[in-house]
Amino acid sequence: MAQAKEVRGPGPRGAGQPRPKVENPGLLLKRIMGEVFQHYLPHCIIVLICIVVSALANVQASLFLKSLIDDYIVPMTQQAAPDFGPLTAALIRVGCIYAVGVLAAWLNARIMVNVTQGTLRNLRTQLFTHMESLPIKYFDQHPHGDIMSVYTNDVDTLRQMLSQSIPQLVSSAITIVSVFASMVMMSWQLTVVTMCMVALMLFCSKKITSMSGKYFIAQQRDLGKVNGYIEEMMEGQKVVKVFTHEQKTLAGFRELNDKLKDSAKQANAYANIIMPVTAQLGNISYAVCALAGAAMAVGGIGGTTLGTVMAFLALNKSFNMPISQVSMQANSIIMALAGAERIFKLMDEPSETDEGYVTLVNAKYDKDDNLVETSDRTGIWAWKHPHHDGTTTYHKLEGDITFTDVDFGYVPEKTVLHNINLYGRPGQKIAFVGSTGAGKTTITNLINRFYDISDGKIRYDGINISKIKKDDLRRSLGIVLQETHLFTGTVMENIRYGRLEATDEECIAAARLANADGFIKRLPDGYHTMLTNDGANLSQGQRQLLAIARAAVADPPVLILDEATSSIDTRTEALVQRGMDGLMYGRTSFVIAHRLSTVRNADCIAVLEQGRIIERGSHDELIAKKGKYYQLYTGNLAEN
């Protein structure tokens, strides 16, 4: 059990394997900001103005120190009766400057919350919209928990980057430029001293960031693996307990969890030392500038005054702080880019191709007995076939399915179906039997184009199904899948899922046809009983009866029943079989069953072995041949 799950999910990376790196970080950042600007450009312009105002207010407040000391405090110390009026007025002015800066910072934060959450909502919507367009094979090849991790963890990494990191970087850049210009004008000598220390800070930050960045990327990917493993184990919890593999499953989780711990520990170990290192280097820069400034003031070098030194030290702090913040935000951005890489990788997955142009429409017969399109639901369906010459023809949907020389493989190098030839005429019941892995379910997956064939043709009412739009093709099919899935909602809503515009009366009629009405009425709230957790409060037989009712309400001309009665007890099977016989009457039906007794009345039984049809005929004909079907039937070897 555990081994099977490990094969499906991404296995742990070997210790000696190189750590992943973000590909094209500049392109990723451009795409992220493109998503922001597409919907929130005016907001971003206001935020930029707020950031500029806030940064300039802080710089202006630092510059005020020089005037405060040289023009007010020092002269007042030399007065017998100092006048505090000018000083008070100056303090009020600088207080107003601070207030404007605080207001701008508050407005910036408020707007960025709206921008960030709106952008994340849009990304999740785009992800879900695109995910629904992906082919089935994508979900066969990717652990579902890993896909869920993209929606949660990876999208959330963008939250801090958009709400804090990028605004902080912009603010830091504006602050650095304005403070640098002010420092140069105030004292180029002290500016040189400051820049030497800044160069050392940048060198240390770059080294630390380069070491932590690769581990942040690994952390996001390892987190996806852990989520994938948890999701799989939750789905298979009953199987784990049946085979008492709890310890083996726990060992698999610990291995992945330890891998996540190691990558997260390495990432945060480096990230957490950036601020202390840059802060201490900033303190050293402050002390060196204080000593140099004091010496210059005492020596009268360059007209340096006490006010100049105090103002420059304030600017020095204002200069070092954004550099430290840039270093800290760099790791947040790297982690966000790692998440963005996974987000855009999913969004860039090619959608399910559909080159069909034949559509399914409601139809009726006009007074000349010609088939014409109508907007009303008449119970008559037609294929609308546009032609190159601009004309359109309508062909009544009959339910005639034909396979001609069909080959198929899930991967190009391995063919699993060979030279399949069969047909289902309107109203016929075609049954597939054979051992596990013979290709029965694969054939039904080809009818609804979950997968496209490698060679040959499948025709629906004489039309190559590749010419039919997939949505219209699937609307013409009623499908009961091998694994019944029920959605969170009422029983009525789950039945109506087969045709969303169906009335309550039509849903109840479908339930009666599937012989589900009896047990539904015995539920606490009948048809309004809430189902949760994939219908866990229902038996397997009841869940399959609802799936059959869901197919019945769609009222399709063609039915695909993929092992619909394989997990139902004998009594329930009898109920289902009676309902299905009524449902299949007049419809082309393709049936796969574990119990051969359920397909005795089929018009044609196809026996598959290793992807080939080795026998075909009615039940009596195949029994008379005494071949594979005879062995399966008399030996009760179906699916064993």
Language model regions located:
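Hydrophobic alpha-helical transmembrane segments of ABC transporter permease domains
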Residues: 30, 49, 104, 108, ...
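Short intracellular "coupling" helices and adjacent cytoplasmic loop segments at the cytosolic face
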Residues: 13-20, 117, 125-149, 153-155, ...
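Membrane-integrated ABC transporters
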Residues: 1-58, 73-94, 108-112, 116, ...
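An intracellular "coupling" helix at the cytosolic face of ABC transporter transmembrane type-1 domains
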Residues: 38-41, 136-137, 153-162, 166, ...
